[in-house]
Regions:
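Transmembrane-helix signature of 12-pass secondary carriers
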Residues: 1-174
Length: 174
C-alpha cells in the first residue's frame, strides 16, 4: 500500500505531462498554468482530509496530474516571456525551484509530522495546500502567452501582453 501512495503520483505526473501542453494549446497556457496549481492545492487538501486509502490514492493521482501538466506549460511560458539572452538562465532557475520545493517539503515533514501528534501527516499535507493561495494571488495576473493569443487571432490581447512585459522590463515600446 505504501508503494502505491508514492507510485500513483508519478503515474499522474506522466499523464499530466503528456496532456498538459496539448490542453494549454487549446484553452490557453495561462488557464492551464493557473489550473495546475489550483488542482494541486485542492488535491493536497483532499489528501489531508482523506478517510480511506482509495481517497488518498485518488487525491495523490490528481496531485500528480496537476504537477505533470505544470511542467510543459511553465517551461513554455518562461521560454516565451524571457528575453532571448536570458532564456536559458530563466529556464534553469525555474527548474531549480523543484529542488527548493523538495527541500521545503522535507523540512515540513521533519518538523511538522513528529511534533503534531497522530494528525501530523494531515497537517503536513494541509500546508501543501497553501500554494493554492499563491495561485489565486499571483498567477491570475500573469498575461496569456503572446504566441497562444496570436495563434488564436487575438492580436490586440497579444499586443497588450507585449506592452505589459515591456513596461515591467523598462523597455520603450517600439
Amino acid at each position: 500500500e505504501k508503494s502505491w501512495v508514492l507510485s500513483i503520483g508519478f503515474v499522474g505526473m506522466a499523464i499530466g505531462a503528456a496532456v498538459g501542453g496539448f490542453i494549454a494549446d487549446r484553452v490557453g497556457r495561462k488557464t492551464v498554468f493557473t489550473a495546475t496549481l489550483i488542482i494541486f492545492g485542492i488535491a493536497n487538501g483532499a489528501m489531508a482530509l482523506s478517510w480511506s486509502l482509495g481517497m488518498l490514492l485518488g487525491a495523490r493521482l490528481i496531485i500528480g496530474l496537476g504537477l505533470g501538466a505544470e511542467l510543459p506549460v511553465a517551461s513554455t511560458l518562461v521560454s516565451e516571456f524571457s528575453p532571448t539572452k536570458q532564456r536559458g538562465r530563466m529556464t534553469v532557475l525555474l527548474e531549480s525551484f523543484w529542488a527548493v520545493g523538495w527541500i521545503v517539503a522535507a523540512m515540513i515533514g521533519y518538523f511538522v509530522i513528529p511534533n503534531t501528534g497522530d494528525w501530523g501527516w494531515r497537517w503536513a499535507l494541509a500546508i501543501g495546500a497553501l500554494p493554492l493561495l499563491y495561485a489565486i494571488v499571483t498567477r491570475v495576473h500573469i498575461p496569456e502567452s503572446v504566441r497562444f493569443l496570436e495563434a488564436k487571432g487575438r492580436e490586440d490581447e497579444a499586443e497588450k501582453a507585449v506592452r505589459y512585459f515591456e513596461e515591467a522590463g523598462g523597455v520603450a515600446p517600439v
